[in-house]
Amino acid sequence: GCGGMVRSNEEWLTSAHGQVLAGKPIVEIIKIADSDPEPLPQGSRPLSGIRALDLTRILAGPIAARTLAENGADVLMVTADGLPQIKEHVMDTNHGKRSCYLDLKSSEDAARLKQLVRGADVFSQGYRPGMLSSLGFGPEELAEIRPGLISLSISCFGADGPFSHRGGWEQVAQTVTGICHDGGIDDRPALLPAAACDYTTGYLGAYGVLLALARRAREGGSYHVRVSLCQSGMLIYRQGKASFAQPDMDLSNSEIEALSVTSNTDAGPLRHLGPVLQLSETAPHWTRPTPTLGGDVAEWLDVEGAANAAE
């Protein structure tokens, strides 16, 4: 389980852990090993030819990998039969990916994952700090397996500080950073009606991966990108609060429809929000619908197959 005490933003910033996070960048990009420079692969899209392993679930991590997929990356979502999933979140956050089952506690499946790592550019995970290191898949171990790999770590409390070992979700981040404290009425704490920390963290994670890939292309190296829900909560809090006196800013049905796309999934046609970011020459889009969990083989597409999928 996980949880957190309701704090004001001032209480959070004066706490030991809040002070640690306040002294760090929102997106940490740490060079952890040397390797030769690797120019980005040639292709028609920003991330054509980039391969990403996505070992995340629920929201923030899947959003990060989904963002890579909408820009042309071959994203393979790795999960295990029996791991808890939320169907609605799976349908919303995995457009453009493939999905396979691997049990990391199985020696055979762990060996298969290591083989996938050797062909990967990005490895994204959302376990508590140190969890995957105990299984031989920490950032440093991964950099030895595949020099030049970009590791993305997503957590609730970040990698350093007295709370770094704790797990947590969107609600925990809102609760401890002051969002919940200030969001209620009549001094009663209340959560935001949306997963703002999760989505913000996912997009920041993808942004960090892009910066790390650019650095790898220029100077080489393996990189560890770190983002956290609490850092995102602190960022959101700093933007200030809207006044109840301000007019309603909800989108109309016609505006929502204009921003939506339809995917033909195994569960049937799915109408959902399209990519948020728009580029004039390389428009982000997904070439695959949300996959069936475990419905793909644990292997990379060949160059020709990846290129066709990226178009």
Where are these regions (language model features)?
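Short, well-ordered alpha-helix to beta-strand connector turns
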Residues: 72, 96-97, 120, 169
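Hydrophobic alpha-helical scaffolding
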Residues: 103, 122, 162, 166-169, ...
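Glycine-rich phosphate-binding loop and adjoining beta1-alpha1-beta2 segment
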Residues: 73, 77-104
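A structured beta-alpha segment of the ubiquitous adenosine-cofactor-binding alpha/beta core
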Residues: 53, 98-144
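The feature captures the short pre-catalytic strand/loop hairpin that immediately precedes
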Residues: 177-193
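Acyl-CoA thioester-binding alpha/beta core of soluble enzymes
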Residues: 1-82, 114, 118-119, 145-158, ...
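Feature representing long, continuous alpha-helical segments
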Residues: 100, 111, 171-175, 203, ...
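Rossmann-fold NAD(P)-binding glycine/threonine-rich loop
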Residues: 134-182
